[in-house]
Each structure stands twice: as structure tokens, then as C-alpha cells.
Amino acid sequence: MENKITTMEGGMQCRTELLLGKDNLEKIQSARVLIFGVGGVGSWCAEGLVRSGVRNITIVDSDRVCVTNCNRQLMATSRTIGEVKVDALRQRLLEINPDANIIACQKIYQAETAEEFHMEEYDFIIDAIDSLKDKADLILRATALPKHITFVSSMGAALRRDPFMIRKTEFWKVDGDPLARCLRKRFKKNKTFPRRKFICVYSEEKPMQNMGDQRLVEHEWCSTKAQINGSLCHITASFGMAIAGIVINHIID
């Protein structure tokens, strides 16, 4: 019987190589990617990258899988509830490609922990965190790194339902996204600005209002947010795959 493991790399990427060529596939395989936040957006981004041939990914998140994650987060299933998110996702990614180098960090990104991640060692840094304060700090630090390190940020994916309104643009050109607006306001208030331009994935759709009762999630042990917004898998997954696409296209362009 054919050894599935030893033939994995050649077999699973034959369609990628057929489309992009051997040289581009090798570039993809050698890229180093750091993903902050592996929830509804980041988990799908990681999967898209691994399936496209990226071998070296570090995933960062401090949370455990909660039952309410099961509607949108890749690794969240009835079996993984209670597990550390990055561990569950790492296992999933290694099932896709056992030869991948997936580093799982159960840590929270904050100004106090930023130096622990050695961002200068990566080719791509993906921001998929939703804390305004921490996101702002990450943006400032990532855009201060050398220009060969590409930074991509996800804006708000909650409270939307139309995947055909998802776009990409430079941060200062994002229109209609409350998260981007709050970030820009924060930068202006503090008089600290990103050192360079960077691409964001966002939605032009006007955010909806939660139609359900907030008490549905008031006892959600896996979240410390004062306000929890509804979200849908086809939106968060589209955000994540769009970011994966930006990374892949940047590698081969």
C-alpha cells in the first residue's frame, strides 16, 4: 500500500504546482507566517495557507475552544470544546500536512508580550485579533518592522452577512468599518501613527444590529468582552481566506 505520509508533499501540492509552477510553489513553501488570533478569521487563514503549500506558520492565541465557537471557527467541534485553540488548530493543520512546521503559542498579544514573538523573523504577519488596544499596538509595531515583512490586518467581520461586500484596501482608505474608524481615531488622539501603509480586509456592508437576546451569551465562559456581537461562518471564513490569498499572491508576484 502506498505510504500516505511520504507521498504527502508531492501529492497534495500537484494542483498548486500545476497552476503556479515549481519555482512559485517553492517560494510558498519557504515563507514564514505569524498569525495573531486564530478565531473566526485567523483559523481559516491558517488552513488556507497550509493547503496552499505554506509550511512554516506560528499561531498565537490564548483562548480555549468554547461551544459558541462552533458556528464559525475552523477547529471548534463537539470534540475539541475545552481544548487550547492553538493546540486544536495545530493538530488540524498537521493532519493536512504532517511535514508542516506549525508552532502553537498559547499567549495573548499585548504591548507587554510583543517582544516575545520575534516578529522580525517572519515574512508575513497577520493581525486577526479583535481587542482595539492590542490591535492598535500590533499595527504600530508591525509597520515599524523592515519593509520586506508584509503586514495584513483584518477589520471587523462580525455583524455582517453578505460575503460579496468583502474588500481589500490600504488601511487609511477603509470606508464604513467601525473598527478601522476607532483605530484611526486612537492613532490621531495619541499622535502615534503606523510607519507605513498596509493592506486590510474589510466589509463595505453596514454592520447589522444583534437581533437576538444578549442574555444568550452572557454566561459565555470563553469570552471576557462586555459586548458580544453575532457573526457568521461564511463571513469570517471569507475574511480569513481573503487574507490567505493576499499572502499567496504577494509571494508569487
Model-flagged regions — what are they?
Residues M1-L34:
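N-terminal charged helix/coil linker that caps or initiates catalytic domains
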Residues E2-T6, E120-F124, I129-K135, F151, ...:
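Glycine-rich phosphate/adenylate-binding loop
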Residues I35-G37, V60:
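Conserved N-terminal Rossmann-fold NAD(P)-binding element of oxidoreductases
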Residues V41:
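Hydrophobic/small residue at the entry helix of a nucleotide-binding pocket
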Residues V50-N56, K147-H148:
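Conserved S-adenosyl-L-methionine
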Residues V54, I59-N97:
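Glycine-rich phosphate-binding loop and adjoining beta1-alpha1-beta2 segment
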Residues Q106-A114:
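Conserved SAM/SAH-binding loop
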